[in-house]
Curated annotation (Swiss-Prot):
One of its GO terms (biological process) is endoplasmic reticulum tubular network organization. Its main location: endoplasmic reticulum. One of its GO terms (cellular component) is nuclear envelope. InterPro entries: Transmembrane_pr_170. This is Transmembrane protein 170A. The chain crosses the membrane at residues 51-71, 82-102, 118-138. Glycans are attached at N31, N37. Residues 72-81, 139-145 are cytoplasmic. May regulate membrane morphogenesis in the endoplasmic reticulum (ER) by promoting ER sheet formation at the expense of ER tubules. The lineage of its organism: Eukaryota, Metazoa, Chordata, Craniata, Vertebrata. The keyword Glycoprotein applies.
Length: 145
């Protein structure tokens, strides 16, 4: 009986976690803080983490299909079959180094202005970083043609 109760509580926690991620509520808190509502990001670390998390996720969303396509088309090539590893590494390493700095800059501007950031703004800034990197990378390839 106790095991069933514990399993039921674990399922509630997992459902709550999934709901939290899907609803963009990165930081759950009670409304006894200085933030305007439960979903706004007020501290520098919360804003930085929100933007950084979305930058990493969106970068992987861009790079994972490219790596899978490269793996499918180049799997029999002697040297080029290792290109998907490079694509995946760039999808992870880029946001880890560049995304950390740009996310900190965005969060610093918000903190210096004394504004709080909504979770949707963190999504827009994070995905925007990856989108700009994608566009610049594509334009650099076109410039070499």
């Amino acid at each position: 009986m106790i095991e069933a109760l514990i399993v039921g509580e674990m399922q509630d926690v997992q459902i709550g976690f999934v709901k939290q991620i899907l609803s963009l509520n990165l930081v759950p808190r009670s409304n006894n803080t200085t933030c305007g509502n439960n979903t706004s990001l007020c501290d520098f670390s919360e804003m930085w983490y929100g933007v950084f998390l979305w930058a990493v996720v969106s970068s992987l969303i861009f790079h994972l299909p490219a790596a899978l396509l490269a793996l499918a088309t180049l799997r029999r090539h002697k040297v080029a079959r290792f290109f998907p590893l490079g694509i995946l590494l760039m999808g992870i390493i880029g946001p880890l180094f560049g995304g950390v700095l740009t996310s900190a800059a965005i969060a610093g501007v918000y903190k210096a202005a004394g504004k709080s950031m909504f979770s949707l703004e963190a999504l827009v800034f994070g995905v925007g970083q990856s989108l700009f990197i994608f566009i610049i990378s594509f334009l650099r390839i076109l410039a070499t043609l």
